[in-house]
Amino acid sequence: MNPAFSVIAFTVLAGAAQGLVVALACAALGGVAAGRGFLLAALGLALVMLVAGLGASFLHLGRPERAWRAAAMWRTSWLSREVIVLPAFTALVALWWLLAWRGGAAPTLLAVAALALAALLWLCTAQIYACLRFIQEWAHPLTLVNYTLVGLASGCVLACALAASFGERALLAAAAPWALTLTFAAWAGRTAALLRNAGLKPKSTAQSATGIRAERVVQKSMGMSAGAFNTREFFHHASALAVQRVRWALHGLGFALPAALMITAAQSGSTHPAWWWLAVASQVPGLLAERWLFFAQARHPQNLYYQTVS
């Protein structure tokens, strides 16, 4: 598939915002106290990321003014369900921020609702792709696992960076081990998906498409002399070397370097925020690379006709 940066930005930003809110909700339910300034900054950042992600997703629409119609098919469409859950989650985060601004503590019900809506939003987003059975790379439970784990890991690392900056040592001590654990878990899940995808074989072949029973069928032409929607939207047009470099960025910047920085901070006993912000700075381009590869690796069956030419 051709990765659209608007969708990549939306899923990375929204996923990290969900993870950040989940970390705050778990801290609230676990009785870990957090200062008003920290909560305002963390919830405000989550709101900005959610709104920015939503704005980025509009750039992918051919007719943005018709976006409201996307919610009409909620009974059968995971995209419609996402369109409903995302504003609900954003509104809940805004309500929490307002309560923090007024100096009130978050009710237990609000924290539980935040956890539930975050989980539901990950489900809706992942199922948009996992429900497409004809794209083998996506049609697997690992799609949901990876969307959830990557969001939790990035959000938890961001929560630790903010906690270190605001001197919230109790919250940092509670969240730091989870940030490292979730980063390794997300790395393992993404590696498992990459290994699985590398071994997939197309279910359709030139022989099955044409009905020719010859052992070897060679396609000589696409049947067209110019580009079209099919050749633009369903193939990334990047070289094998470029894809390999993106894969290196995924592993190195997205997971290995942030994990190394977190381990170094833990072993040195340092609570300086620089370690955590360096981890965030490394993780952002790494996760953009991860999400680009997620889309680029998806092989649409139509590419057997439009892309395989001798």
Model-based region annotation:
Residues 1-52, 284, 296-297, 308:
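N-terminal signal-anchor module of multipass membrane proteins
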Residues 1-3, 65-69, 300:
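N-terminal juxtamembrane cytosolic/stromal segments of multi-pass membrane proteins
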Residues 5, 11-13, 32, 76-77, ...:
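Long, contiguous internal "core" modules enriched in hydrophobic/ aromatic residues
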Residues 19, 23-29, 62-64, 158-168:
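Membrane-helix interface motif
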Residues 36-92:
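Membrane helical hairpin/interfacial module
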Residues 61, 65, 189, 295-299:
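Short helix-terminus and kink motifs of transmembrane alpha helices
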Residues 275-310:
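C-terminal structured interaction module
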